[in-house]
Amino acid sequence: VGDVTIVTSDSRFRLSETSLGIPPAQIAPFVRERVGLTHARRLMLTGARFKGDEAVNFGIAHLVVADSEELEEACNEILSDISVCAPDANAFTKNILFESLRRPRSEVLDYAAAGFANCMLSPEGNEGVAAFIQKRKPYWVEGSLRK
């Protein structure tokens, strides 16, 4: 399961396990989380084929582009966007999101608050706030002067 998934309009998908006589056991929970129970049932029980635009509609992909050239451009844009975000902050953000699937909301809020405080006191957090105040790029951004 990718954080950001880009497909071409002619990308082809199929959850074909049941047509092979086996259940989609390993992927089923992830597909159900991503597309919902109703779509997961149809896609898995029929082995339905679908293309890139439908993958976006199902929530399997985030963006559909016309061809491989546009795919490379879109990937570069996404990577550029990610590169301006602090690596540790992104890692903890992913942890919060995954914990929100496993824990009650009140526990996740406590977990997130503690992590926020730790990040604010970390070298990365200090650098991010200082860079913002000083109107400069933080050290993790390509092309910044500080490392």
Positions of predicted regions on the chain:
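Helix-loop "lid/cap" segments that line or gate small-molecule binding pockets
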Residues: L43-M44, A55, I96-S100, A114-M120
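Amphipathic alpha-helical segment in the mid-to-C-terminal domain
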Residues: L109, S122-G125
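Terminal low-complexity tails and localization/encapsulation signals of metabolic enzymes
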Residues: A130-K147
